[in-house]
């Protein structure tokens, strides 16, 4: 009798153990129904369909017609439920299905700016294509736009991809764990071969895994004049830090999470205890070489940037920086600058079909300030060696002296000295030597026609010389007083002229005049 009872107990224990194994393989909130493309419940008129007061942070982006976002309470937590199936994208049908939450982006690039997500995830199932490279589902992604074009208009920087690992024996057809990979760009806008996939770690099915993702900007420890854009993750206590390529092109830091991509089968991901924080620090930059007149010397060649003196013609380089057409000022235009020649107009940075050739920088007769997109520049200052790089707008292209002497604006690393310039103040015009200040002199109207007036604010005795672009003296006179009116009696033809004012201490100031 005892033997029979013992045998029954053994059988019962084995049966209970078997049930425990089955239960462990199926999560309490797992969807075990047949996989279909769409359901009536999951089909919505808009992507923003959500429940009131969801426990997960962020704005829903539901592009799946299989199921809606809902919530479950298991293991002492309330979980956001993200279920998607193959081909269930009812919006933007060329893209992959997803139910994700988008978090407001950190839109500043100053050191200390970041976006940070924390939470806990469980993975129950991911997309399966029978072991191909298309296996898996993204559970989170770092986002961020950049200057200079290339790739998607809203590119992913690093995606965290879960690929299925199948069991053995009776579990050979069951996903029992998941390999987590980082799919990250090799360069800005990288897609396809422009990305690498790096294994991070394995997590078990239905295992509660702590997750933290921070994307932001910090100081480069090797060069305090530069910064790093980073994407750092902590998954289940393991840290995976990565620096994003071309940090100078990054314009923001963002995060999305949920369930995204299923090229076969179904994906089920759960998120709980999500929090989000962002910090936005405005980038502090050198205001640029303003308030004086400069010669711009290319670091690689030692030559000086010169204006051609002809509108829509390519600028040139010269061995000497002493001619008037080598003198430049920087005119503020909002947060950007115009680069203004003392004898002609502001520089233009055309595109591939520019009048001087593809991306060749050309002269204009236009006065600054101008907000025209092809006439504004971002000034990048390197404090460590007192040099500048001039970026056309926010394009990621920099003023560059080519080997053939042409001056273009192209994508170039900051280590390429052909894109690096010295701004050398013209000594005779130095404010430190009591030169006439720019704010002390006005010329109006400018452009002029029949006459123009020179107004002097703090001085009352000057010699006025007016030159044409060839250096010929067109007008010369001495004046006492604070206002000088000059009539055009035919000596000023249509074109650009340089006004030179010299005070009694031999300080000089140059002002440009345009005659229509």
Swiss-Prot record:
Optimum pH is 8.5. Its cofactor is Ca(2+). Ca(2+) binds at residues 42, 44, 62, 64, 67-68. Induction: By ulvan and rhamnose. InterPro entries: Beta-tre_PLH30, PL28, Ricin_B-like_lectins, Secre_tail. Optimum temperature is 29.5 degrees Celsius. Substrate binds at residues 138, 191-195, 260-263. The active site is at 143 (proton acceptor), 260 (proton donor/acceptor). Residues 1-24 form the signal peptide. Keywords: Calcium, Disulfide bond, Lyase, Metal-binding, Secreted, Signal. Its main location: secreted. It comes from the Bacteria. Gene3D superfamilies: 2.80.10.50. GO terms for molecular function: lyase activity; metal ion binding. It is found in: Secreted. GO terms for cellular component: extracellular region. SUPFAM superfamilies: Ricin B-like lectins. The ulvan-binding domain binds strongly to ulvan, it does not bind other polymers like alginate, heparin, dextran sulfate or iota carrageenan. Presumably it serves to anchor the enzyme at the substrate, thus improving catalysis. Notably, the catalytic domain alone is more active than the full-length enzyme with the binding domain attached. Possibly, the ulvan-binding domain helps the enzyme to act on ulvan in its insoluble form embedded in the algal cell wall. Ulvan lyase involved in ulvan degradation. Ulvan is the main polysaccharide component of the Ulvales (green seaweed) cell wall. It is composed of disaccharide building blocks comprising 3-sulfated rhamnose (Rha3S) linked to D-glucuronic acid (GlcA), L-iduronic acid (IduA), or D-xylose (Xyl). Ulvan lyase catalyzes the endolytic cleavage of the glycosidic bond between Rha3S and the uronic acids GlcA or IduA, producing oligosaccharides that have unsaturated 4-deoxy-L-threo-hex-4-enopyranosiduronic acid (deltaUA) at the non-reducing end. Belongs to the polysaccharide lyase 28 family. This is Endo-acting ulvan lyase. It comes from Formosa agariphila (strain DSM 15362 / KCTC 12365 / LMG 23005 / KMM 3901 / M-2Alg 35-1).
């Amino acid at each position: 009798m005892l033997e029979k009872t013992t045998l029954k107990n053994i059988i019962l224990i084995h049966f209970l153990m078997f049930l425990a194994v089955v239960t462990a393989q199926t999560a309490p909130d797992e969807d075990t129904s047949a996989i279909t493309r769409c359901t009536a419940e999951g089909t919505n008129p808009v992507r923003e369909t959500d429940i009131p007061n969801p426990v997960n942070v962020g704005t829903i982006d539901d592009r799946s017609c299989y199921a809606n976002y809902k919530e479950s309470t298991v293991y002492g937590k309330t979980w956001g439920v993200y279920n998607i199936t193959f081909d269930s994208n009812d919006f933007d049908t060329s893209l992959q299905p997803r139910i994700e939450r988008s978090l407001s982006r950190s839109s500043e690039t100053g050191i200390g700016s970041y976006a940070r997500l924390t939470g806990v995830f469980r993975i129950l199932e991911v997309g399966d294509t029978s072991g191909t490279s298309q296996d898996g589902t993204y559970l989170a992604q770092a986002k961020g736009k950049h200057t200079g074009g290339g790739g998607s208009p809203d590119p992913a920087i690093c995606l965290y991809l879960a690929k299925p690992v199948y069991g053995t024996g009776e579990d050979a057809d069951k996903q029992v764990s998941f390999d987590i990979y980082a799919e990250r760009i090799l360069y800005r806008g990288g897609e396809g071969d422009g990305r690498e996939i790096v294994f991070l770690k394995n997590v078990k099915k239905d295992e509660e895994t702590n997750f933290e993702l921070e994307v932001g900007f910090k100081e480069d420890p090797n060069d305090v004049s530069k910064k790093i854009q980073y994407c750092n993750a902590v998954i289940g206590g393991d840290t995976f830090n990565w620096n994003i390529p071309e940090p100078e092109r990054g314009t923001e830091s963002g995060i999305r999470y949920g369930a995204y991509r299923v090229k076969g089968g179904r994906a089920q991901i759960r998120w709980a205890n999500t929090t989000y924080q962002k910090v936005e620090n405005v980038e502090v930059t050198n205001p640029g070489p303003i308030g004086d007149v400069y010669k711009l010397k290319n670091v690689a060649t030692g030559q000086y940037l010169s204006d051609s003196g002809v509108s829509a013609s390519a600028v040139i380089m010269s061995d000497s920086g002493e001619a008037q057409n080598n003198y430049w000022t920087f005119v503020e235009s909002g947060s950007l600058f115009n680069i203004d020649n003392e004898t002609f107009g502001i520089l233009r940075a055309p595109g591939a079909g520019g009048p001087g050739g593809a991306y060749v920088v050309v002269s204009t007769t236009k006065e600054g300030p101008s907000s025209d997109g092809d006439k504004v520049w971002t000034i990048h200052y390197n404090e460590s060696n007192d040099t500048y790089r001039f970026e056309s707008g926010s394009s990621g292209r920099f003023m560059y002296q080519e080997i053939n002497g042409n001056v273009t604006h192209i994508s170039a690393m900051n280590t390429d000295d052909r894109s690096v310039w010295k701004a050398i103040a013209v000594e005779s015009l130095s404010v430190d030597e009591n030169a006439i200040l720019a704010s002390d002199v006005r010329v109006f109207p400018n452009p002029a026609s029949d006459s123009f007036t020179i107004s002097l604010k703090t001085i009352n005795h000057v010699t006025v010389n007016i030159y044409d672009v060839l250096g010929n003296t067109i007008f010369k006179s001495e004046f006492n007083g604070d206002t000088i009116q000059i009539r055009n009696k035919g000596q000023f033809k249509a074109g650009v002229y340089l006004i030179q004012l010299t005070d009694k201490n031999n300080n000089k100031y140059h002002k440009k005049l345009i005659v229509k």
